[in-house]
């Protein structure tokens, strides 16, 4: 009798271990979700749908986290509509898509992780969520159709190479309290023509805007303390730099730039 009770207890505990992760299916869509400290987390999507609307799938409408590599290297999806209360997109979640064209993000997303949309060459994205606080490293690296123009107000960190080679970006307005623009964050954005820097900016790091070949002039904020190695290197159209402070400027910060006027 005692052995029987122990066996039942063990079986019950084993069942509990499996509860956090649920494999679910709806039609031709296949996915796995689990509980996390932030709420429901999508672990993996294995469907072949061309359009994925989380809000139309009962089991996914309350997802708070898109997990690491959840959709990585998908070749079917063209459009994603993320759930209304999503908070976190983990690293490599939508990395290296062949056909992804549009992603609709709700104004609840706080964090987009490293390489989350890396090398999504067909992705056309013009607006980031107002709720966004942090953008990881290589997040939109080589997404040459991404054309955002405003960095949201609450973004406190932009990782290295976050927007490298985003050729669709023509203007950048930093509406935030960002203090550092990290290494190569916007390097190779060859159609970038205009930048409005944030008022609290302290540092423009190495190669941050290197090879932005259509950038013609910049007005640097009074808060700026440092301009790094080749920060504007090979900006071959850059003619005008206005200083409103006396930052420490690396001797190669403007290498191969035809800067003719500095104040």
What do these predicted ranges mean?
Residues 18, 138-141:
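Tryptophan (W) side chains
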Residues 1-11:
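Bacterial N-terminal signal peptides that target proteins for export
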Residues 23-27:
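Boundary at the C-terminal end of the N-terminal hydrophobic targeting segment
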Residues 10-20:
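Bacterial N-terminal signal peptides
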Residues 28-37, 47-65, 75-88, 98-111, ...:
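Structural signature of tandem-repeat unit edges
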Residues 67-70, 90-93, 113-116, 136-139, ...:
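Consensus positions within tandem repeat domains that build extended binding/scaffold surfaces
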């Amino acid at each position: 009798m005692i052995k029987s009770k122990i066996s039942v207890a063990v079986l019950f505990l084993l069942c509990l271990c499996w509860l956090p992760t649920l494999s679910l299916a709806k039609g031709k869509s296949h996915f796995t979700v689990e509980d996390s400290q932030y709420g429901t987390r999508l672990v993996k999507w294995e469907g072949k749908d061309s359009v994925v609307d989380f809000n139309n799938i009962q089991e996914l409408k309350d997802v708070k986290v898109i997990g690491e590599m959840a959709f990585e290297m998908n070749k079917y999806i063209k459009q994603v509509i993320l759930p209304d209360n999503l908070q976190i997109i983990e690293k490599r979640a939508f990395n290296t898509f062949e056909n992804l064209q549009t992603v609709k993000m709700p104004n609840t997303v706080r964090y987009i992780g490293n390489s989350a949309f890396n090398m999504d060459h067909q992705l056309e994205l013009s607006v980031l969520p107002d709720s966004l606080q942090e953008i990881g490293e290589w997040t939109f690296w080589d997404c040459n159709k991404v054309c955002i123009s405003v960095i949201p107000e609450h973004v406190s960190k932009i990782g290295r190479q976050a927007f490298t080679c985003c050729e669709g970006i023509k203007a950048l307005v930093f509406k935030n309290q960002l203090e550092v623009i990290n290494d190569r964050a916007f390097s190779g954005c060859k159609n970038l023509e205009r930048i409005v820097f944030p008022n609290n900016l302290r540092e423009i790091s190495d190669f941050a805007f290197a090879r932005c070949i259509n950038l013609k002039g910049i007005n640097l904020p009074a808060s700026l303390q440092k301009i790094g190695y080749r920060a504007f290197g090979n900006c071959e159209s850059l003619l005008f730099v206005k200083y409103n402070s006396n930052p420490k400027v690396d001797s190669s910060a403007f290498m191969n730039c035809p800067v003719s006027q500095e104040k």
